[in-house]
C-alpha cells in the first residue's frame, strides 16, 4: 500500500491527479545522461513521475556522497515545463528526506554558486540551455559547485532503472521540507559584482543585451545598469514559449543589428540559462569564446595571473586562435566538447582560464562554473580598461581560419553514438585530412545534447573547408541518416 506524505506537501500536491499506472516510467535504452545531465522533450522522457524519481535518487546519492542531510538548491529557467519539473524534483528530494531550497528563475551559475557557498549538499538546475522551448533538462551540481562526476550520475541512473515509483513512495515516512527562497539569488548577484575591478564604472558605454527570454532577464540588465552602462535590452521578459527562438547566443543576427542600429559600443547574447555568452563588437562583428579567451588570457598573462600561460579549450577551438596564443608564449590544452571536460582539465593542469568557442567561459579566479553574465561584465571591464573600442582589440588579436560547421540529424541513437564504426565515413575523413595536411583539420562528433552528428572542417583556404564539410555531410546523410 502506498503511504502518502502529509496534506499540503509538494509530493502530495503533485501526485494527487496521477492514477497509479501513470506513475510508471518506461526508460529508453542507453545512458540517460549526456554531456550536461539529462535532456529531452518535456512530456516525453521528462514527465512529472520521471522527475520525481530523479529527485528521489539524486537525493539518495547526494546524501551518501556528503555523508549528511542538508538542503538541495533548485533553480530553473523560463520554459513552460520548468515549473512542473522543478516541483516534481522537489517532491522526490523531500521524499528522500531532504530539505529543498527552491530559488526559482535564475542562471545556472547561480545554482552552482549557492551549492558551493551555502550549507547545501548539492544543486539541481532545470534547463536545456540553448535548446528550443519544447526541450528541457536536469543538471546536477555537487556541494563544490561542480557538475556531478560520472560515477555519481551512474548511481542516480542505476536507481532509476532499479526500482519502481510505487516502491519509492512506500518508503516516504520521513519527508523533508520545501522552501521557496528567491532571496538567495541576491547572494549570487553580490558575488558576481565582487569579482569586478574595484571602482569599475561603465558610464558612457552603450551596451545591448540579448536575454533570450530566459534566465538572465532580471540580473544581467541590473548589473550593467548598476555599473553605469546605458542598457538596451532585447527579449527581456521570461517567456517559456519563446526562450532561445531566433535569439540568444545561437542566433546573433538581431543582436548584431541592434548594436549597429543603436550605435552601441558592444553587445552580449546569453543562452536560456545564461551559462554562456557570445559578444558583438561595435561594428557588429561576432566575438566568440575563442576571442574572449584570447583577450582575457592576455590580460591575465600581463598581470601574472595565468600559470604557465595555459588556457584550456576544446577540439572546436580555432587554429587561428591557437597559433596566435602560441606566439604570445602561451599554450592551449584541448579537451572534448563540454564544459565539464574543460573544468576537469583545468583542475588537472592547474589552469585558471578555460572555455569553449560556443561561449562557455570558466575563470577559476572567480568561479567554478561557466558564467555568461560574469564573463560579459569582465569583457566590458577589459574594454573600459583598454580605452579603445572592442573592434580594435579584435583587429589586434588574431585572424580565424575559415571554419564550417554543419549538423546532420541522425535519429537512430546507436548509429549516432557509434558513428566511428562507419568505415566509409572514416575513409573520407582520412582523405580530407590528407588533402589539407597541417593547414586544416576535421572534427566529426555526435552531439551530447541533440540527435545530430556535427561535422566541422577548418582550413587556411576557405574553399577547402567548405568543400570537405559538404562532402562529409553527404557521407553522413547517405550512410548514417
Swiss-Prot record:
Keywords: Isomerase, Magnesium, Metal-binding, Phosphoprotein. The modification Phosphoserine is found at residue 129. Activated by phosphorylation. One of its GO terms (biological process) is UDP-N-acetylglucosamine biosynthetic process. It holds the Pfam family PGM_PMM_III. The keyword Transcription does not apply. It is an enzyme of class 5 (isomerase). GO terms for molecular function: magnesium ion binding; phosphoglucosamine mutase activity; phosphomannomutase activity. InterPro entries: A-D-PHexomutase_a/b/a-I, A-D-PHexomutase_a/b/a-I/II/III, A-D-PHexomutase_a/b/a-II, A-D-PHexomutase_a/b/a-III, A-D-PHexomutase_C, A-D-PHexomutase_C_sf, A-D-PHexomutase_CS, Alpha-D-phosphohexomutase_SF. Its cofactor is Mg(2+). The keyword Phosphoprotein applies. NCBIfam families: glmM. Belongs to the phosphohexose mutase family. Catalyzes the conversion of glucosamine-6-phosphate to glucosamine-1-phosphate. This is Phosphoglucosamine mutase. It comes from Picosynechococcus sp. (strain ATCC 27264 / PCC 7002 / PR-6). The lineage of its organism: Bacteria, Bacillati, Cyanobacteriota, Cyanophyceae, Oscillatoriophycideae. The gene is glmM.
Amino acid at each position: 500500500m502506498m503511504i502518502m506524505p502529509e496534506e499540503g506537501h509538494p509530493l502530495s500536491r503533485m501526485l494527487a491527479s496521477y492514477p497509479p499506472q501513470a506513475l510508471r516510467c518506461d526508460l529508453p535504452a542507453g545512458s540517460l545522461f549526456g554531456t550536461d545531465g539529462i535532456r529531452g522533450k518535456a512530456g516525453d522522457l521528462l514527465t512529472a513521475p520521471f522527475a520525481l524519481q530523479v529527485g528521489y535518487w539524486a537525493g539518495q546519492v547526494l546524501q551518501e556522497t556528503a555523508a549528511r542531510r542538508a538542503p538541495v538548491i533548485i533553480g530553473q529557467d523560463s520554459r513552460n515545463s520548468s515549473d512542473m519539473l522543478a516541483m516534481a524534483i522537489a517532491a522526490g528530494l523531500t521524499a528522500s528526506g531532504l530539505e529543498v531550497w527552491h530559488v526559482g528563475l535564475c542562471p545556472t551559475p547561480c545554482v552552482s554558486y549557492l551549492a558551493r557557498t551555502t550549507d547545501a549538499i548539492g544543486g539541481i538546475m532545470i534547463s536545456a540551455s540553448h535548446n528550443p522551448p519544447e526541450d528541457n533538462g536536469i543538471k546536477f551540481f555537487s556541494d563544490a559547485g561542480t557538475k556531478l562526476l560520472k560515477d555519481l550520475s551512474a548511481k542516480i541512473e542505476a536507481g532509476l532503472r532499479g526500482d519502481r515509483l510505487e516502491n519509492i513512495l512506500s518508503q516516504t515516512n520521513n519527508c523533508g521540507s520545501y522552501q521557496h527562497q528567491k532571496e538567495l539569488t541576491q547572494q549570487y548577484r553580490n558575488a558576481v559584482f565582487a569579482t569586478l575591478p574595484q571602482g569599475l564604472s561603465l558610464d558612457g558605454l552603450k551596451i545591448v543585451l540579448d536575454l533570450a527570454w530566459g534566465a538572465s532577464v532580471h540580473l544581467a540588465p541590473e548589473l550593467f545598469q548598476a555599473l553605469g552602462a546605458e542598457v538596451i535590452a532585447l527579449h527581456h521578459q521570461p517567456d517559456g514559449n519563446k526562450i532561445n527562438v531566433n535569439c540568444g547566443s545561437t542566433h546573433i543576427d538581431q543582436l548584431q543589428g541592434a548594436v549597429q542600429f543603436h550605435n552601441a559600443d558592444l553587445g552580449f547574447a546569453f543562452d536560456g540559462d545564461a551559462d554562456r555568452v557570445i559578444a558583438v563588437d561595435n561594428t557588429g562583428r561576432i566575438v566568440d569564446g575563442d576571442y574572449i579567451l584570447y583577450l582575457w588570457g592576455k590580460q591575465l598573462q600581463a598581470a601574472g595571473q595565468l600559470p604557465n600561460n595555459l588556457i584550456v579549450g576544446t577540439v572546436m577551438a580555432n587554429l587561428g586562435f591557437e597559433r596566435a596564443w602560441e606566439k604570445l608564449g602561451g599554450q592551449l590544452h584541448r579537451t572534448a566538447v563540454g564544459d565539464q571536460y574543460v573544468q576537469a582539465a583545468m583542475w588537472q593542469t592547474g589552469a585558471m582560464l578555460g572555455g569553449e568557442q560556443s561561449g562557455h567561459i570558466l575563470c577559476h579566479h572567480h568561479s567554478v562554473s561557466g558564467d555568461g553574465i560574469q564573463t560579459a561584465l569582465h569583457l566590458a571591464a577589459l574594454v573600459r580598461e583598454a580605452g579603445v573600442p572592442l573592434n580594435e582589440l579584435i583587429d589586434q588579436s588574431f585572424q580565424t581560419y575559415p571554419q564550417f560547421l554543419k549538423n546532420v540529424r541522425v535519429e537512430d541513437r546507436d548509429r549516432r553514438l557509434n558513428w566511428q564504426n562507419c568505415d566509409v565515413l572514416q575513409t573520407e575523413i582520412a582523405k580530407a585530412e590528407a588533402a589539407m595536411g597541417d593547414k586544416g583539420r576535421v572534427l566529426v562528433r555526435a552531439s551530447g545534447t541533440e540527435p545530430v552528428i556535427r561535422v566541422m572542417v577548418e582550413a587556411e583556404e576557405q574553399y577547402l573547408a567548405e568543400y570537405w564539410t559538404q562532402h562529409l555531410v553527404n557521407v553522413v546523410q547517405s550512410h548514417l541518416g
